Amino acid sequence: MNLEVKKIDTANARLSTKLSVEDLEKRYDKIAQKIAQRVKIDGFRRGKVPLSLVKTRYQAQIEQDAQEEMIQEVLKNALKELGIETKDLIGSPNFTKFEKKDTHFEIEADIGLKPTIVLDKIQECVPSVGVEVPNEEKINERLKQLAKDYAKFVDTDAQRKAQNDDKLTIDFEGFIDNVPFEGGKAENFSLILGNKQMLEDFEKALLGMQASEEKEFPLTFPSGYHAEHLAGKEALFKVKLRQIQAREALGINDELAKIVLANEENATLELLKERVKGQLFLENKARLYNEELKEKLIENLDEKILFDLPKTIIEQEMDLLFRNALYSMQAEEVKSLQESQEKAKEKRESFRNDATKSVKITFIIDALAKEEKIGVHDNEVFQTLYYEAMMTGQNPENLIEQYRKNNMLAAVKMAMIEDRVLAYLLDKNLPKEQQEILEKMRPNAQKTQVG
């Protein structure tokens, strides 16, 4: 074996070698014998299939297995020559040349190695952090909302007219051209006026009605209505208002605190205010981090943390970004790329900068997560997907299986780890008094959220 290995930088190496066809063919018998032991061919007992028949029937597989065996041997020798352990090899080699000549194969390949990352400049990358601390006005607004949200609905007198924020129980039926339409009928249907559970014009027609009152009114479905058979259609609705209930006002006092903080012993209004302040602070922090600081931190990490990147991984990321982009392209653009290899190469190349940045940030986040012992359990990934399914009306089990089939669970976990690492770095840069607010909230992280 004529092997040449050159280390390009700390994360990349290149090998070139010539492998004799004779060496390849010597491997055929050994591989064919392994195949013969496990295959069953009619007329022969298992393990008794003639080698000549196996070589004929499984020729392509034998050649492929022999080539793979030789390649693994080449890689093993290349790593040995470089003084690198197998665990430091990252990704699959990128074969830039694999040509069969009369007597030998000419092979050239790029090898990716785990990069060396120095994290001593991390603190320089973290932007200054100052989260808005909620004032009394904001706290009182949230308390009023809590008093409203936790208020019970109670029956009203028969003379009351329906108004926004009342809970109504109605029967209704819709007609188009005097014919009832699918999904247009319900009995004992509950809604809260003003919450936009129904079309705005439908809810407006209910305002001012009294219990036991019946009413007919026209309604035009929006042109972009989700049920296509109703979009833009003129309808007539017949409604009977069965019941009106109004919220029973709750005072902002210790009683409210006991209702909201039901799991707390001796809950008081002061404790509730403290929890509300903490909750609002967390919301402000999340908004600031997600809308501004995390992206700024990523830009700083990309700019200031310098190290060699394995080109093989960048190429793989470019392929991934290119494939994903194809799904959102117009059919005409996809066809244009299929018809022109040059255009396809140019389009793929346009993803190089994004791919390089993505790979670099992934390596940095991984190194930081290991150093700070930040991780995500599989159960947390499943919980995240369950929540996504709930919010989008999907079956959770089906969604998880879809992610599993497409090998996307690892990507979800990595995204969650990235989010935690970035938040950890930013939290460390909070002013001392704001870190104290966070510390007060942590023991209550598993308890009832307020608002």
Which positions does each model-derived feature cover?
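Extended, charged alpha-helical "arm"/coiled-coil substrate-binding scaffolds
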Residues: N2-Q67, I139, E173-I176, G208-M209, ...
